[in-house]
């Protein structure tokens, strides 16, 4: 179980994820069931790509936003080849093409407590994973979100190891 807390309303839960390896596994109704490891993901923030690269999961990216702000050569080649779809502006996502893409999950950076774009994405019925690392007050706090991403790919140990290396180098 992963719980993301609302950075704009301390103590309030933003979303809860129940990670399962079997689609038929029952989970509580107060959160979202996500079958892991993810096989495809769309992300609306270039910052998520660095984490995915460190985890060896760039090949799971099927959609991005604002590819003109992305400098990862693997992702840019995918956009050029058409294997990765650019869904436009992260603040005004192309919902129709998101539905056509149908990734297993959408990783998004919520931009405020009542994010209209997130509300529109939720209406698609696709699992929305809120990665709000940009709200962390410290660089290590931001880096620690690799553990969040790693969990969705069943790579918690690798994510912990990567974070430990980052923390050691930083300190």
Question: Model-derived features: where do they sit?
Answer:
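Aromatic-residue detector
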Residues: 1, 15-20, 32, 145, ...
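Extreme N-terminal leader/targeting regions
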Residues: 1-12, 116-121
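A short, structured surface patch at a secondary-structure boundary
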Residues: 6-99, 105-111
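Extracytoplasmic substrate-binding proteins
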Residues: 83, 96, 100-109, 113-171
């Amino acid at each position: 179980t992963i719980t993301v807390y609302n950075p704009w309303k301390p103590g309030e839960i933003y979303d809860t994820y129940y990670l399962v390896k079997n689609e038929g596994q029952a989970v509580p109704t107060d959160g979202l069931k996500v079958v892991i490891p993810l096989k495809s993901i769309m992300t609306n923030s270039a910052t998520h790509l660095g984490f995915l690269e460190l985890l060896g999961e760039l090949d799971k990216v099927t959609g991005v936003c604002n590819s003109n702000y992305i400098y990862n050569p693997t992702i840019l080649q995918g956009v050029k080849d058409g294997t990765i779809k650019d869904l436009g502006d992260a603040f005004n996502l192309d919902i129709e093409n998101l539905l056509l893409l149908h990734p297993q999950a959408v990783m998004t950076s919520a931009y405020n407590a009542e994010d209209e774009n997130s509300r529109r994405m939720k209406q698609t019925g696709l699992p929305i994973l809120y990665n709000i690392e940009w709200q962390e007050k410290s660089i290590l706090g931001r880096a620690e979100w690799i553990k969040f991403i790693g969990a969705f790919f069943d790579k918690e140990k690798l994510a912990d190891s990567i974070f430990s290396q980052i923390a050691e180098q930083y300190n």
